[in-house]
Amino acid sequence: VVYAPTEPAEARLLGGQVATMHEGRITQCGPVADVYRAPADLRTALVFSDPPINVAQVHKRGEQIELPGAASWPVPSALRSRADGPLQLGLRPHHVRRPGAGGVAVRGPVLISELSGSESVVHFDVAGTTWVSLRPGVQDYAVGETADFELDVAQALYFDTDGRRLSS
């Protein structure tokens, strides 16, 4: 039996095997958890994240990954042999955490804070890119307030400029 939901959330809830498609072609197939944890490309990562995955342009320069105008961190071992240049970073909202959680510090003005059940979805700007943080409980941020966050870059997904996932 094949069930073809149009909503990615339904596919995630059904579990089992899943196939993702784009323009009539299968882009990835496998167990739901595997596709979620290791999406083959940026399009799959975007579809399989709710709230949507944060995507930012970063640069590999020597032994550092740079988020221009905001932060830098050591290059993951799997990307060390890759030539310097632009990459796309994917980081799910629950990996953008409160300060003191042990990640890469970023700060920026809050654009909006929404309550979603027992969690808050906080949208904020870092160097011209909108980021989303999924935080437990009710977070009371005023629009325009400068807020501090930490990126759990150990959980980051890296993609080339064409959107293909790189080992990380």
Predicted regions: what they are:
Residues P31, R43, Q57-H59, P109-L111:
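Residues located in well-ordered beta-strands
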Residues A33-R37, A45:
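Short acidic-hydrophobic catalytic motif
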Residues V1-A4, T6-L13, P31:
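Conserved H-loop
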Residues P51-V55, E63-S168:
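Non-catalytic connector elements of ABC transporters
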